[in-house]
Every structure is written in C-alpha cells, then in structure tokens.
C-alpha cells in the first residue's frame, strides 16, 4: 500500500511504503463478532510501526480490508513473519492459510469524534448517526468505542429527534423489504418474561384472517429461548430472503430467524455490546425495535410490554415512557404502533426452553384441555389488536374474532401450512433427564423470580439443547402442599442437570411461598 501526494511541480510522488506484509496462519480462535489480529511480541512490524497491545490496525488482503485489534503472542504459537486472525476477521477477509496480509495504521475515525460530541452532551445529526452506525457495522469501531457511544446515549441522553435519526440510520444500514399488500402487520415483545411465546399463536391467527404478517424473530440473547429457537423445534427458521418472501406470499405469514435476512444488521452488533456491559437504554431499545419492524416492511406494529419487578421493564412509569417513545418515533417514521402493557410478574405457560415452550404453543393451537390459559389469553389479546389494524375489524371486536379463528381450528391449520412452507413440520423431542423440585412446606405462591428461573433453565442446557429447560407446575396465587412439585428441571445430560441443581442450592428464593389465607 503506497500513499501518494502532489509535488510542487504537479507530479505525483510516492511516499515510502507504509504497509507491511505478514503470512497468515489459521489459529481457529472464536471471538464472536470481534476482529482480532495476533502478532509476535518480537515482530519487526510491531517495532517499526509502534504497534502495541490493543492498537487498532488496518488489515488488507486483496480487495478486502478490516480494522482489527492487536493481541500480542509471547509463545511459539506463531513463527517469525506470521500473523493470526480471529475466526471473525478470517472470514471477513476471505482468508486462506499462507495468504499474505498487509498491515498499517488506519486513518483517524470521523465517527469517533461524533462519539465524543455525544459524550459531551451535544445533539447528533442524522448524518453523524449514519457515520457512527456505518462504522459499527463495518467493524471500524471497536467494542470499547461502541460501548462509549452506548453509554453516552443511555439514561435519557438521546432526545426524541435523535432516537428517530438513530432508528433511520439503522434502517438505512441494511435491506428493507417491500410486500404486495398495502397493510403489513408485525408484532414484538419487549421481553424479560420466560415462556411468553405468543408469536407462534398470533401469526397463524392473523394470517388465517387474511392479513399479511412476515415475522422475523431473534434467537435467545440472554434468555433460555428466543422465538426463533422455539419455532426451530417445529420447523426450519433459517430461510433466505427469497424463500421468506415465497412463504409469506403463499401463506400470508412466516416465523423465521431475523439473522438470515439482513434487516437493521447494526442492531445485532449494538445488542451484543449492550449485553456485555449489561445496559438497557430506552433510546437504543426504541431504535432497535422500530428499525427491525420498519425494515421488515411493516405498516402497523403491535408491541407487548410486560411490566414486572423481574421483567425487562420493571415499573409502570418506565413502561409509559417506553410506550410514548415507541408510538411517537414510530409515527414520525410512518409506522402505526399499538403498545399493550401486560403483566410481567411471572412466567407465562408451563414450559421454559425451546421444546417445552413449543409444547405449550401446540396445546393452545390444538385447543387441548391442559393448554396454559395465560398464554392463550395473552396471544388472543395481541392477535385481536393486530386484527384491529384492518379497517374490516371494528375497534374492540378483534379479540373475539381472534378467539373464533383459534377455536375453529383455522389457526392450527394455518400454523401447519406455514411450517410446511418453511421446510416441513418437525416432531418435538423430550429430555433424557428430569429432576422435580418440591415445596419444602405448604403455602400459597406469592412470588416467582423470572430471572433466577431463566438462569436455571439455561444451566440445564437451554436453548442449545432444545429439550432442556423448566416445566413450571405452580403459578402465583396457587396453593401447594408440602412435597408437591413446584417445577421440574429437564436436561439432555446429567452434567448439566447437576449444574442446574447446584444453583438451586445457592438460590432458595426462586419461588417464594406465603401463608395459605
């Protein structure tokens, strides 16, 4: 790589070569989405360029170029003249063993100066937001730099206008779907509530009515199952954009993994960094939800906000603030948003974990006598709100129409058709190991800690092991006898079952029993 500049007489003068060549060795190190370059401590390039640990380095291979963070190797893992890359960087450069890469100092980042602007409390323009989001997506900003932007944008530091600009920048960073129908409905749940798997019931009800509902869902980020994980136990969810379109045009709806279609891709990077610093900011949450809905091509969105002490939204005032933001920013960007505040005090249904949640969904769709009523009622409320987006449905009548579609068996028939169109319906699997957890005394269930219950389900192997998780037998307000099962842990391996049981011994207050009144 040469830098050139004009001499006084107008001729081009080549500066000395500032990029250095190193031979690639495949190390097979996974860093998730972070680009890392590994170089020897005594590497001649490190010395001549002044590269130190954590330096950001421009790495070029043929037509591909990325910015990676330097990690220094002090062992014989690399031979002199060799460099290694994290798997993410290796794939981004389309690298092969023995390829020669060029390394150099990157140009100063304009986006970083805009991050500083935000840190000092100034408002950002759409253009500045767009530069930041583009650099997030291309990997030019490191995770540390992204976390500085997220922190500077949290705790109400983004104005309503900035949230709108950020949302727009995130939409513009990826693809945007368009559909043959003038009315396209979407639904979303803000989250934090185990077992709240209403999507798999809402989509077939709305599609059976005749409205278009192309649903892209996420896999679990910190929960025991995401909607895509649960759906995957029943049908393929990894569909190309072309296949997704085919399913929707044929059946009016789909339930697919959003990661396979490039909608608001910068959001996935921001969520990953937010998770690492355990940060949930209202502005980012609004931009995240709305950018995904608008990129999907939705004209109307129904958003479920569960409110409870151990849900994502902990109290009514937070919920109302979020509701107002979602509706106002959505309106500015041409999306009609209906928000519904729901009870987030305890898990929904009986199952927590992909297969167990799918079992609950199937029992509701099939109208079985043991179907969880709370899951059914929530799904009907949300489906009713979605149906009322249509001028054919009078306000207030949506839920009863949704109920008719569910009880007639049309929703189950539509769900089967969607599964077939996505690649074929699958049989649910059962876990090999189970362990019941019983009540130490008689009493009435007064509190269930969603977060601790979700943690046990994850230790048992969910969502990676599809059949792992928890089967909840007691809900808030129900009386139990001493020795009666409160919940059963399901696991694919005895080792994971033991992990989950170990946590139980540490955390006795997962389900709190009060006196029977």
UniProtKB/Swiss-Prot annotation:
Pfam families: Glycos_trans_3N, Glycos_transf_3, PYNP_C. PROSITE patterns: THYMID_PHOSPHORYLASE (PS00647). GO terms for molecular function: 1,4-alpha-oligoglucan phosphorylase activity; thymidine phosphorylase activity. It comes from the Bacteria. It is an enzyme of class 2 (transferase). Its EC number is 2.4.2.4. Keywords: Glycosyltransferase, Transferase. GO terms for cellular component: cytosol. Gene3D superfamilies: 1.20.970.50, 2.40.40.20, Nucleoside phosphorylase/phosphoribosyltransferase catalytic domain, Pyrimidine nucleoside phosphorylase-like, C-terminal domain. It catalyses: thymidine + phosphate = 2-deoxy-alpha-D-ribose 1-phosphate + thymine. InterPro entries: Glycosyl_Trfase_fam3, Glycosyl_Trfase_fam3_N_dom, Glycosyl_Trfase_fam3_N_dom_sf, Nuc_phospho_transferase, PYNP-like_C_sf, PYNP_C, Pyrmidine_PPase_CS, Thym_Pase_Put. One of its GO terms (biological process) is pyrimidine nucleoside metabolic process. Belongs to the thymidine/pyrimidine-nucleoside phosphorylase family. Type 2 subfamily. This is Putative thymidine phosphorylase. It comes from Legionella pneumophila (strain Corby). The lineage of its organism: Bacteria, Pseudomonadati, Pseudomonadota, Gammaproteobacteria, Legionellales.
């Amino acid at each position: 790589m040469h830098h050139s500049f004009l001499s006084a007489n107008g001729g081009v003068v080549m500066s000395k070569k500032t990029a250095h060549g190193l031979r690639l060795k495949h190390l097979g190190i996974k860093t998730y989405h972070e680009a890392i370059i590994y170089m020897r401590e005594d590497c001649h390039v490190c010395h001549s360029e002044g590269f130190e640990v954590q330096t950001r380095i421009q790495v070029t291979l043929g037509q591909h170029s990325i910015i990676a963070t330097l990690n220094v190797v002090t062992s014989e893992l690399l031979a002199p003249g060799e460099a290694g890359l994290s798997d993410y960087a290796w794939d981004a450069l389309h690298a092969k063993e023995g390829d020669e890469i060029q390394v150099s100092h990157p140009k100063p980042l304009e986006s970083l100066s805009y991050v500083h602007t935000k840190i000092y409390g100034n408002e950002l323009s759409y253009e500045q937001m767009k530069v930041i989001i583009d650099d997030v997506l291309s990997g030019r900003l490191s995770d540390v730099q992204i976390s500085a932007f997220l922190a500077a944008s949290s705790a109400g530091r983004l104005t309503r206008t900035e949230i709108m600009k950020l949302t727009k920048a995130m939409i513009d960073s990826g693809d945007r779907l368009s559909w043959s129908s003038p009315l396209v409905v979407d639904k979303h749940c803000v989250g934090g509530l185990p077992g709240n798997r209403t999507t798999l019931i809402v989509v077939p009800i709305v599609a059976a009515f005749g409205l278009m509902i192309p649903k892209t869902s996420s896999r679990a980020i910190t929960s025991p199952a995401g909607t895509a994980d649960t759906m995957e136990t029943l049908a393929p969810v990894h569909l190309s954009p072309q296949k997704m379109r085919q399913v929707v045009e044929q059946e009016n709806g789909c339930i697919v993994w959003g990661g396979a279609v490039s909608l608001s891709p910068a959001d996935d990077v921001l969520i990953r960094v937010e998770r690492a610093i355990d940060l949930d900011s209202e502005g980012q949450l609004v931009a995240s939800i709305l950018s995904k809905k608008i990129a999907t091509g939705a004209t109307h969105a129904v958003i479920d906000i569960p409110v409870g002490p151990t849900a994502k939204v902990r109290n009514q005032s937070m919920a109302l603030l979020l509701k107002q933001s979602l509706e106002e920013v959505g309106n500015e960007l041409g999306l009609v948003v209906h928000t519904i505040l729901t009870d987030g005090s305890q898990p929904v249904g009986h199952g927590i974990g992909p297969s167990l949640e799918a079992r609950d969904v199937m029992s509701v769709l099939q109208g079985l006598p043991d179907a969880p009523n709370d899951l059914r009622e929530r799904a009907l409320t949300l489906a009713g709100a979605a149906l009322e987006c249509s001028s054919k449905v009078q306000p207030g009548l949506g839920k009863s129409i949704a109920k008719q579609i569910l009880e007639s068996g049309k929703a189950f028939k539509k769900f089967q058709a969607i599964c077939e169109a996505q690649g074929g319906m699958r049989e649910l699997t059962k876990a090999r190991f189970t362990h019941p957890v019983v009540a130490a005394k008689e009493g009435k269930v007064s509190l269930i800690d969603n977060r601790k219950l979700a943690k046990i389900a994850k230790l048992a192997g969910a969502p990676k092991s599809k059949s792992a998780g928890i089967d909840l037998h007691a809900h808030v307000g129900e009386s139990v006898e001493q020795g009666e099962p409160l919940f059963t842990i399901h696991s694919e391996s005895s080792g994971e079952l033991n992990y989950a049981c170990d946590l139980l011994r540490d955390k006795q207050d997962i389900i709190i029993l009060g006196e029977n009144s």
